[in-house]
UniProtKB/Swiss-Prot annotation:
The gene is dtd. GO terms for biological process: D-amino acid catabolic process. This is D-aminoacyl-tRNA deacylase. Belongs to the DTD family. It comes from Deinococcus geothermalis (strain DSM 11300 / CIP 105573 / AG-3a). PANTHER family: D-AMINOACYL-TRNA DEACYLASE 1 (PTHR10472:SF5), D-TYROSYL-TRNA TYR DEACYLASE (PTHR10472).
Amino acid sequence: MRAVLQRVTRATCTVEGRVTGATGPGLLILLGVAPEDTPETAWRLAAKIVKLRVFADETGRMNRSVQDIGGGILSISQFTLYADTRRGNRPGFSGAAAPEHARALYAEFNAALRAQGVAVGEGVFGAHMMLDLTNDGPVTLFLDTAES
């Protein structure tokens, strides 16, 4: 799995004019799923993300997690994180999981986040989504479970 995390003051996902998910202060997560990913991968990544200390403490140092601040998460499925741009000018996506597999693991990932007490808003899997967010920092991190 690959995840792009952005620390946000707010984020909203809209599909066809309808808000499907939102968060106040917290994280926006763009999640990509690979064919070899499993439910265990989803739970491990979720556990890592909710404990990452990317929010400022009283001294201004990044020392608090999304759990610590009582923040929320907006989780968005994004197969394009597995784009291969090495050849030509059109990205290939053969490194991304098949839609059925990715949909199941996206749901598992969101369940794992919720199981750790974090409020989670969601996008709509496979839909064309409009994201509106305010980055905080900005702080943007890239996590890849294949590298852990």
